[in-house]
Amino acid sequence: MTRVKRGYVARKRRRSILCQRAGSRGAHSILFRNAQQQNMKAMIYSHEHRKKRKRDFRSLWVTRINAAVREQGLSYNKFIFLLKTHKVLLNRKMLAQIAILDITSFKKLLLVIN
């Protein structure tokens, strides 16, 4: 029988996957097959949540703006409409930061667009 000389490559591949699963508990960090399946699942989750993070932050900004605007007696929808008609170039992230950190500036902005 001839000698197979590819053992190192297979070992390297398995070791790299087991190293990726180093923080896991139980068989997921010890057994190669379980570790490989768990690694695939983890990569799927990380991809999904990278996309989901953007949606989550946008909804957080909208909620913060809505809370700040309602204190001044205006709805979020009306506020965004007024911003667009007055050609104010602040995005929702900036508006949320202003609403939280600098309330006086936010009130001045409301006076400008009303």
UniProtKB/Swiss-Prot annotation:
Its main location: plastid. One of its GO terms (cellular component) is ribosome. The keyword Nuclease does not apply. It comes from the Eukaryota. Gene3D superfamilies: 6.10.160.10, Ribosomal protein L20 (1.10.1900.20). Binds directly to 23S ribosomal RNA and is necessary for the in vitro assembly process of the 50S ribosomal subunit. It is not involved in the protein synthesizing functions of that subunit. Belongs to the bacterial ribosomal protein bL20 family. The keyword Ribonucleoprotein applies. This is Large ribosomal subunit protein bL20c. It is found in: Plastid, Chloroplast. NCBIfam families: rplT_bact (TIGR01032). InterPro entries: Ribosomal_bL20 (IPR005813), RIBOSOMAL_L20_CS (IPR049946), Ribosomal_protein_bL20_C (IPR035566). One of its GO terms (molecular function) is structural constituent of ribosome. Keywords: Chloroplast, Plastid, Ribonucleoprotein, Ribosomal protein, RNA-binding, rRNA-binding. One of its GO terms (biological process) is translation.
